[in-house]
Amino acid sequence: MKLNVDGLLVYFPYDYIYPEQFSYMLELKRTLDAKGHGVLEMPSGTGKTVSLLALIVAYQRAFPLEVTKLIYCSRTVPEIEKVIEELRKLLSFYEQQEGEKLPFLGLALSSRKNLCIHPEVTPLRFGKDVDGKCHSLTASYVRAQYQQDASLPHCRFYEEFDAHGRQVPLPAGIYNLDDLKALGQRQGWCPYFLARYSILHANVVVYSYHYLLDPKIADLVSKELARKAVVVFDEAHNIDNVCIDSMSVNLTRRTLDRCQSNLDTLQKTVLRIKETDEQRLRDEYRRLVEGLREASAARETDAHLANPVLPDEVLQEAVPGSIRTAEHFLGFLRRLLEYVKWRLRVQHVVQESPPAFLSGLAQRVCIQRKPLRFCAERLRSLLHTLEIADLADFSPLTLLANFATLVSTYAKGFTIIIEPFDDRTPTIANPILHFSCMDASLAIKPVFERFQSVIITSGTLSPLDIYPKILDFHPVTMATFTMTLARVCLCPMIIGRGNDQVAISSKFETREDIAVIRNYGNLLLEMSAVVPDGIVAFFTSYQYMESTVASWYEQGILENIQRNKLLFIETQDGAETSVALEKYQEACENGRGAILLSVARGKVSEGIDFVHHYGRAVIMFGVPYVYTQSRILKARLEYLRDQFQIRENDFLTFDAMRHAAQCVGRAIRGKTDYGLMVFADKRFARADKRGKLPRWIQEHLTDSNLNLTVDEGVQVAKYFLRQMAQPFHREDQLGLSLLSLEQLQSEETLRRVEQIAQQL
């Protein structure tokens, strides 16, 4: 259908539209008109992706000079593929309406591991090895040697792409990862470099967060993208953690030992080259005097280790004299390494700021701040000059150099914590240095400054106002949308007591209490008797899950549960978990029914949708607070309190509730889907916890369902499931939660649509 969204003609590839999709498009258009940033919370399963794509593509076509590109960031590869499929649908609808092929290019970009087609590289399992192997076949000096001697190893796909792929831009169309690989096989071009080259003139690019937020990668991939782009972060409820991880470095004793052997290897290589080809080292010295910008003008294939973060003025100036020659630089790294090793020989925990660390460094081993900032770049230049083929071996040393660059660049927003042992195993000496980022806004700030509109969206962003605070930006629109339903298909309830009236909670004091564990088991047992097909249960941590399940086994509860449904458990091993998931789905298909026990913040809670019968009930055992004794977390809470005036308790509750909402949101994946959401902890009933749930869940959480016993909860569930089992046709939805074009244009509907969005 063709819609008029606030004066913009939008092609929408379906015959009917949800009212909230229309409302979402209105808010989105206002954000783009204002050329600002937006935070939008849209209920899960209401067609967020297609609304985003339809509106922004229409905007691109109406104002080609205002918005040149859509950069869509998603979290996992399956999600990226989903977005590309929606885009394909949208485009074929455009072509069917206009009767001609559009000059439109949309593509997905992923790591070499997912795109490489070279027969020697594809069998490798880990991304790091794939990158290293690729570099050893495509580095500029490897290719130069191959020009002289054709028998040397090389990558024919890259050679072919380099020779012919650049003149011909990618033909218009939509490409997912498999399409790119197929095209690569057909033409004999490298799909990875083809995709990287093509994102510059693509209309829509879909890739993962790291390509924009991790400065080491963003510098390589996203540097050339124009300012007039719209960036969308989808499923962005965890975006602050992604930002923090991309800027943090952990150094262990093992890493440092491997740095030592890296340095020895480099030392030998330098000596060998001095004897055979001293001119090469002289050339490098000359380049470094001219400034880093010249030194890094090497080919794209060599830019394998990018720089963590360097402002432009540093790249312009010459490298300090003390680290210009290769031997001096290696000596410099040795002194740095010795100092860090010495710092790791501690008996108690040390916490200090980067400036304090630097002054200690200057006093002990006379290393100044300025040469440290050049460490990462200087190492990159050296590895290039020495023609090191396999860069994966040098990742420990690269990590140390990145740490040096970061520690000398940022004085605020970071902390250094040195722990002599892991808290969980205090007897084993296992020292580790955490260089931990506490300010999520550091990584995302360049994105907000560089692109004219950044949209942060997810099903669970409540409370909305905390995101602009922790990411430090000013949105022009902030809105949360309700879910318009023809029948109430979600049933949230809070179970706070067992049948024996014992309060149930996962808090630390009552965690080991046998009565609480028994009541939790009883809840799962009774639910497994009334809920059809699949139940997903989330615990607060792996430890808690293991101890609870062991206790249920002793009490014979597990045996009774198994009579109703089969049990599957998520473990920390990825391969085991995928098998468990597969079998869980099989058991649901066969009608045997299944229960999946998993962990909030685990793999299952983040990316896996339990559509229809795979998840008819989600049970949240306890409030999923993060492990609060961790020193890194304490430092971050302190920073948030001082810098952004966010109270510790508010942040912890916000963090726990967004994860709880994320877990229970897995059950509802569309308006025809239905499911129970059981919050099993008396603390959920408190106003401060309940108020932090997304608006679309809060609306259906009635006062009568706030503090139930297990029996009352089961009665509510029975009644709800019986209602849901009645036949439900599309006709029942029409005009209420599903609109045709005529209905959408009526005044009454437009008035209703106005009320869906709640601005902040």
From Swiss-Prot:
A motif (DEAH box) lies at residues 234-237. Binds 1 [4Fe-4S] cluster. Residues 438-637 are annotated as: Mediates interaction with MMS19. Its main location: nucleus. It holds the Pfam family DEAD_2. [4Fe-4S] cluster binds at C116, C134, C155, C190. Changing K48R: NER deficiency. Its cofactor is Mg(2+); [4Fe-4S] cluster. Its EC number is 5.6.2.3. Gene3D superfamilies: P-loop containing nucleotide triphosphate hydrolases. GO terms for molecular function: 4 iron, 4 sulfur cluster binding; 5'-3' DNA helicase activity; ATP binding; ATP hydrolysis activity; damaged DNA binding; metal ion binding. It is an enzyme of class 5 (isomerase). InterPro entries: ATP-dep_Helicase_C (IPR006555), DinG/Rad3-like (IPR045028), DNA/RNA_helicase_DEAH_CS (IPR002464), HBB (IPR010643), Helic_SF1/SF2_ATP-bd_DinG/Rad3 (IPR014013), Helicase-like_DEXD_c2 (IPR006554), P-loop_NTPase (IPR027417), RAD3-like_helicase_DEAD (IPR010614). One of its GO terms (biological process) is nucleotide-excision repair. A motif (Nuclear localization signal) lies at residues 682-695. SUPFAM superfamilies: P-loop containing nucleoside triphosphate hydrolases (SSF52540). GO terms for cellular component: CAK-ERCC2 complex; cytoplasm; MMXD complex; nucleus; spindle; transcription factor TFIIH holo complex. It comes from the Eukaryota. It catalyses: Couples ATP hydrolysis with the unwinding of duplex DNA at the replication fork by translocating in the 5'-3' direction. This creates two antiparallel DNA single strands (ssDNA). The leading ssDNA polymer is the template for DNA polymerase III holoenzyme which synthesizes a continuous strand; ATP + H2O = ADP + phosphate + H(+). Residues 7-283 form the Helicase ATP-binding domain. ATP-dependent 5'-3' DNA helicase. Component of the general transcription and DNA repair factor IIH (TFIIH) core complex which is involved in general and transcription-coupled nucleotide excision repair (NER) of damaged DNA. When complexed to CDK-activating kinase (CAK), involved in transcription by RNA polymerase II. In NER, TFIIH acts by opening DNA around the lesion to allow the excision of the damaged oligonucleotide and its replacement by a new DNA fragment. The ATP-dependent helicase activity of XPD/ERCC2 is required for DNA opening. Component of the 7-subunit TFIIH core complex composed of XPB/ERCC3, XPD/ERCC2, GTF2H1, GTF2H2, GTF2H3, GTF2H4 and GTF2H5, which is active in NER. The core complex associates with the 3-subunit CDK-activating kinase (CAK) module composed of CCNH/cyclin H, CDK7 and MNAT1 to form the 10-subunit holoenzyme (holo-TFIIH) active in transcription. The interaction with GTF2H2 results in the stimulation of the 5'-->3' helicase activity. Component of the MMXD complex, which includes CIAO1, ERCC2, CIAO2B, MMS19 and SLC25A5. Interacts with CIAO1 and CIAO2B; the interaction WITH CIAO2B is direct. This is General transcription and DNA repair factor IIH helicase subunit XPD.
